[in-house]
Amino acid sequence: GINKDAIITVEPNKKYMVQGIKFETIPAYNINKTFHPKENDWVGYVIELNDIRYYIAGDTDITEENKRVKCDVAFVPVGGTYTMDFKEAAQLINEMQPKVAVPIHYGSIVGTKQDAEEFIKLLNQNIKGTILMR
């Protein structure tokens, strides 16, 4: 487990190292919705493990900050309503150009497995789409 003395409060646009794990925070917010305002300072994460960079977007739309993320694997919401939808998520991924993209945030509150499947179809051919939630 993680030593509770290592638990920290994070802020957007910062780099951290906790118990040897490097990560940075990327602002996560809505552009044209009120659910996740930028002022709340909520974040997604880029975590580096074994020289592989993983981006976990969190609840967000396409933003100037996440368009600049450099990563190998990206986990992005596709459910719409509270976050970007599958078309917007594919647009973001095609701009970011990770090696692998994984759709998240669908199938329970909003979004469907079909959203995840449609997301995969919209990815550039050089990006591998992977559905983890069946």
Where are these regions (language model features)?
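Residues at alpha-helix termini
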Residues: G1-I2, Q19, M96
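Helix-loop-beta element that forms the nucleotide-linked donor phosphate-binding surface
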Residues: G1-T9
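Short, glycine/charged-enriched secondary-structure capping and boundary segments
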Residues: I2, K38-N40, V69-D72, E88-L92, ...
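A structural micro-motif
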Residues: D5, I21, I52, C71, ...
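Binuclear metal-ion centers of metallo-dependent hydrolases, dominated by the metallo-beta-lactamase
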Residues: I8-K15, A90, N94-R134
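Core dinuclear metal-dependent hydrolase active-site scaffold
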Residues: T9-K70, M84, R134
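Short, Lys/Arg-enriched charge-dense amphipathic segments
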Residues: I31-P37, T81, P103, K128-G129
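Metallo-beta-lactamase
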Residues: V46-G111
